[in-house]
Amino acid sequence: MQSWVEVSLNTPAQLSLPLYLPDDETFASFWPGDNASLLAALQNVLRQEHSGYIYLWAREGAGRSHLLHAACAELSQRGDAVGYVPLDKRTWFVPEVLDGMEHLSLVCIDNIECVAGDELWEMAIFDLYNRILESGKTRLLITGDRPPRQLNLGLPDLASRLDWGQIYKLQPLSDEDKLQALQLRARLRGFELPEDVGRFLLKRLDREMRTLFMTLDQLDHASITAQRKLTIPFVKEILKL
């Protein structure tokens, strides 16, 4: 079952924000497929002692949030202060949550497309970007569902800033890579996913990775409860296929 870790974010601006991140979304659990260069770039930015910026885009469900969670986990394990701002949940907080984040080691802004056209949020992100440039110490990772110039932002200067750094498209996984990703997730959870069962899932289910991972978790729980190994007949029974 998925569990969560809490990361405390503290800044000199007296902001205290608890971050709850899934503890299984790390670099070790990310199957790169054709994204090896992207993964290397992310890890290089995290290793360096000065600021760095990467913009990562892909359709929803491709693994954008996984990589940001992994980056937060890696630096927080080193004792560094990190900030993760999921803009698809922006109703939970206000733009002022970004105040003081230039003092953190890492800031991750997820799903920036969700605030396109929102003047307050766009200005808050633009101001944070400029403060990070001035500080020269904070790493900034931003994700969106399209390249910066296609975000339909109301603030042209923000679109220009987002277009400055390293920009990567997260490439979708092939079916073979999806099978490897499923088997990796299974191994990390302490069980084996037979190849024939994995190929059956890819053939019969929606191939979006989030759906596949949720199904794998369901099958893991069912297998433990029934004390049965994962076989195609058992999978058919559980999923009613």
From Swiss-Prot:
Q: Which InterPro entries match?
A: Chromosome_initiator_DnaA-like (IPR020591), DnaA_dom (IPR013317), Hda (IPR017788), Hda_Enterobact (IPR022864), Hda_lid (IPR055199), P-loop_NTPase (IPR027417)
GO terms (BP aspect) = DNA replication initiation; negative regulation of DNA-templated DNA replication initiation
Signal sequence extent: none
Q: Which UniProt keyword terms apply here?
A: DNA replication, DNA replication inhibitor
Superkingdom field: Bacteria
Keyword Methyltransferase present in the record's keywords: the answer is: no
Q: Which PANTHER family match?
A: CHROMOSOMAL REPLICATION INITIATOR PROTEIN DNAA, DNAA REGULATORY INACTIVATOR HDA
- Cross-referenced NCBIfam families, in alphabetical order? DnaA_homol_Hda, PRK08084.1
Instruction: Kindly state the subunit structure of this protein.
Output: The active form seems to be an ADP-bound monomer. Forms the RIDA complex (regulatory inactivation of DnaA) of ATP-DnaA, ADP-Hda and the DNA-loaded beta sliding clamp (dnaN).
Q: What does this protein do?
A: Mediates the interaction of DNA replication initiator protein DnaA with DNA polymerase subunit beta sliding clamp (dnaN). Stimulates hydrolysis of ATP-DnaA to ADP-DnaA, rendering DnaA inactive for reinitiation, a process called regulatory inhibition of DnaA or RIDA.
Family statement: Belongs to the DnaA family. HdA subfamily.
UniProt protein name: DnaA regulatory inactivator Hda
Organism in which the protein naturally occurs? Salmonella arizonae (strain ATCC BAA-731 / CDC346-86 / RSK2980)
